Amino acid sequence: MQDSGMQVLFQGNNLLRILQGLGVTIGISILSVLLSMIFGTVMGIIMTSHSRVIRFLTRFYLEFIRIMPQLVLLFIVYFGLARNFNINISGETSAIIVFTLWGTAEMGDLVRGAITSLPKHQFESGQALGLTKVQLYYHIIIPQVLRRLLPQAINLVTRMIKTTSLVVLIGVVEVTKVGQQIIDSNRLTIPTASFWIYGTILVLYFAVCFPISKLSTHLEKNWRN
């Protein structure tokens, strides 16, 4: 006699495993975003340089990362580095590297846009006070830029959480991979397991991403007001 499909969620520690997999997904996303904010802020400042060479290099990096699918980058980092350079790198580390490269490009362009949108007198006032360029950015420019960027940075978290489903293809045991394992082990006894497992994963993604998306919208409205 076949079991009810919904029972697969409560067999053994299946539900706990799914939640632990979700934790891996969120962990990769948050760490990648934090690194992206740091490197992206630096890159955004560099992108405002008057040097044509620097602007060309940063723009090339930005367009290259945007054009290249994240899945291809994951394969290059995880399989390419391991085989060609004998580097032992885990799937989680590969994912963080790739998502940080992607996030840095996205964040860098946002920082560049935020800096160039600031009124020119902000820079002139700092220079008139005798501030060095480092002091000008540290005390005046970056605080304003970060405030403007916070909603976009939070929105980037949701995009990364959803994109992390790709890391299942390099063996990372995140929420989608856990779901596949549970489905495979119950394929014969519970044919409808895939519906309940993937349905649960969908609900979990929504439960995580929706509040983050609303927070981003709320902060953006407050900033505009």
Residue locations for each model-derived region?
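Transmembrane alpha-helices and adjacent helix-loop boundaries
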Residues: 1-225
